[in-house]
Amino acid sequence: MKLKLKKLFRIKQKDPHCSVVVVAAGSSERMGGDKMLMTLGAKPVIIRTLMAFQQCPMVDDIVVVTRREKIMAMADMIKLYDISKVSQVISGGATRAESSLAGVSAVRKGAKLIAIHDGARPLVSRELIERVVREANEHISAVPVIPSTDTLKKIDENGVITGSVDRASVVRVQTPQVFDADIIKGALTKAVEKHLPITDDCSAVDMMGFSTYTVEGDTGNIKLTLPEDMVLAEAILKSRGE
């Protein structure tokens, strides 16, 4: 009689691994300076972002996408802080899709999952990273979301309210967004070639007809856009004891 060992012993599944693209190629116009280099809790914003992925065991390598004129300064800073998982620092494109495509094209060969993250979200936690990676490993595409707590209205071209939006059907999407490597490469290639108006990376996947699953996001995982966001980020760090 043959016995199947899987029925006798619980086999521990290995955690999925991924490559990461950190997009830090924006102009930072609304911030009034290069937010990636601004100090947050005694460290540059971009370094805090990269350290979150450096310390996550599910992450194999990191590609940083920045502006061409910032490549050397970024590379020197990464070396100074010993962010060893960064394999490349490359220049981005004119649009988010172009920058993301450059990044996913530069990750290590053989990567099955690719996470794309805003460089301006330095407070991302290891727990959130792992939660999204696990979901994408199950469903090929996953993003973190948080509920909308504001009242949402529709307006016409004149700015007149025409109706309300059910908050139960609306969420705020964060990063990292994690995808099957082949699918995100194909989706971003199509978005760039056809000049599709995407505002985040899962939009490109959605336009190809693939479903994107969601996981619980983190209200502390804010995106630094305006000067007052830095004040909030410092407060969040303080509340975390950092």
Question: What are these regions, as identified by a protein language model?
Answer:
Residues K153-F179:
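Short, flexible, basic/aromatic active-site loop/helix in glycosyltransferases
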Residues A94-E157, Q174:
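Conserved beta-loop-beta/alpha segment of the NTase-like Rossmann-fold superfamily
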Residues V22, I46, G103, H117-D118, ...:
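Residue-level signal for inorganic ion chemistry
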Residues T39, L123, S164, V178, ...:
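Short aromatic/basic micro-patch
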Residues K2-P16, V171-E242:
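Conserved alpha/beta core of the MobA/IspD/sugar-nucleotide pyrophosphorylase nucleotidyltransferase superfamily
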Residues Y81-A94:
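Conserved donor nucleotide-binding strand/loop of the catalytic core
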Residues M72-M77:
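Acidic helix N-cap motif at the loop->helix transition within catalytic regions
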Residues R10-I71:
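N-terminal glycine-rich phosphate-binding loop and ensuing alpha1 helix
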